[in-house]
Amino acid sequence: MSKMAEEKAAAVGGLGGAGAADAAQQQQLAAGEAAAARVRPVETLLRAAPLGLCVAAMTVMLRNQQSNEYGAVAYSDLGGFKYLVYANGLCAAYSLVSAFYTAVPRPATVSRSWLVFLLDQVFTYLILAAGAAAAELLYLAYNGDKEVTWSEACGVFGSFCRQARTSVAITFGTVLCFILLSLISSYRLFSAYEAPPSSALGSKGVEIAAYPR
């Protein structure tokens, strides 16, 4: 009889512990949703900011062309500048969609946090790569490359280079915005995971494996 009583008491204790854990988890979710509601307006504005920057950078580059007695040049003649235009267009669309997505209150879930985190990472690296490629083209246009006998071109097409430089500078402003968004989404995602309790390490603490020599 005593053994059965002990088993019943253990079962009741286990149910009580599970109920307490569920209650604690619900409180944690409620606190997280309250914090998200306070941060939502700021994050929405931050997600909308790259939209204007991307459109500005794209517009400046699309209008970038120059012709004189030495010839004519346009952004479409250079693959790096075309990539910059495409990347800014994609990032502008993502900025608009993500701003609307963030502005609408919805329950926070781990799957949604993972989705936003991954998309933020993809578009951050996309716009960073576009800015870096365009910046390298600008460097060659201003300085040339003696090793491959490329002469600088900005002395002849100064207006073209200035407009390209403006577009690249705006693009790197977009990069900074996306880096901040990536930090926010990564914090939101990984703060949902708790560190393992110290009891999981065992009474002896962390054991270091010894390999035979």
UniProtKB/Swiss-Prot annotation:
Organism of origin: Zea mays (Maize)
Annotated compartments: Cell membrane
Subunit structure: Homodimer and heterodimers.
Membrane topology designation: Multi-pass membrane protein
Keyword set, alphabetical order: Cell membrane, Membrane, Transmembrane, Transmembrane helix
Pfam families (UniProt xref): CASP_dom
InterPro entries from the UniProt entry: CASP/CASPL (IPR006459), CASP_dom (IPR006702)
Segments in the Extracellular topological domain: 63-83, 135-166
Transmembrane stretches, start-end: 42-62, 84-104, 114-134, 167-187
Lineage per the UniProt record: Eukaryota, Viridiplantae, Streptophyta, Embryophyta, Tracheophyta
Stored NCBIfam families: A_tha_TIGR01569
This protein's name: CASP-like protein 2A1
Assigned protein family: Belongs to the Casparian strip membrane proteins (CASP) family.
Ranges facing Cytoplasmic side: 1-41, 105-113, 188-213
PANTHER family: CASP-LIKE PROTEIN 2A1 (PTHR33573:SF46), CASP-LIKE PROTEIN 4A4 (PTHR33573)
An annotated GO cellular component: plasma membrane
